[in-house]
Amino acid sequence: MIRVPPPVRPGAPFRGGTLTDRLVEPRVPRDLHAFIAGLPKAELHVHHVGSASPRIVSELAARHPDSKVPTDPEALADYFTFTDFAHFIEVYLSVVDLIRTPEDVRLLTYEVARELARQQVRYAELTITPFSSTRRGIDERAFMDAIEDARKAAETELGTVLRWCFDIPGEAGLESAEETTRLATDDRLRPEGLVSFGLGGPEIGVPRPQFKPYFDRAIAAGLHSVPHAGETTGPETVWDALNELGAERIGHGTSSARDPKLLQHLAERRIPLEVCPTSNIATRAVATLDEHPIKEFTRAGVLVTINSDDPPMFGTDLNNEYAVAARLLELDERGLAGLAKNAVEASFMDPAGKARLAAEIDAYTSSWLAS
């Protein structure tokens, strides 16, 4: 059994390699890593601020020296050591506080797209929390313009299509829910790339049903429902997300494995789970990789997608997460291609876009196996 020795050092500047390097490299053949590196992909659960690379975090911290976020890479590695989920949220919010101008927003967004493109991610639904920026004084119109400018540049220059999920920061209460809903549904502000509406932050003490009126408004405005649920609480939170918030996909859903009826429900209705294995270890939502419920999900026939969540903070990226999945599920190239196509199916791309990306995955896999 593989265990993460405390303290977990999930930050990308981790000395001696990333968390997933330590866990996966000895057990996954190098040619499979090479296959993963070139595999065309879609990513559905990746956070905007949580994707800030150590270089960008250091640059932003230097721009805003009143922040407590360190600029030194060694100190940043220590800073990105999380004791539990609550501590992760505390650190995450301190990085959010570095995003103070529209220029910061555009820089971050484009650099996130650049990193996705490096991993052959053709399409990504990036979770953005506009409330966290507008409450810090960024003009809401300027914020929308910044993410849209970066989105268009990324598609033209990098070949990566970005779409947005606006999420409610649950720890900020119903005020944030109202503001996020307004920004997501006001046609004068709503960005062209917005496709979905979510709910993040702590689950404990933040019951999902209280957000039903806001999700109802977002769904009525044509947005898809993709709340986090069952990451740090039990399967009842997933049921609430489904029954009260109209969830079409579940962010994490880790505890779903504890409820056979829920697994059956997810499988029969083809409701995808956005699985983020390394994140679950780093935040202590799951004790060890060997105990991760991804195996139970696939055995039950649940549509599983692989995602990186907050990759630099957890010392991972999407390629590493596919390697984790290969190790846990004993997958070969065709199995990994199947996971990539799961993400395409579960995405909110138009049918033509889904068909193109699925065909590209098939062509890449066939070419690889024939070589």
Describe the predicted segments one by one.
Residues 3-5, 14-223, 232-237, 244-249, ...:
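Metal-cofactor-binding active-site regions of metalloenzymes
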Residues 10-12:
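Targeting/processing segments of secretory and organellar proteins
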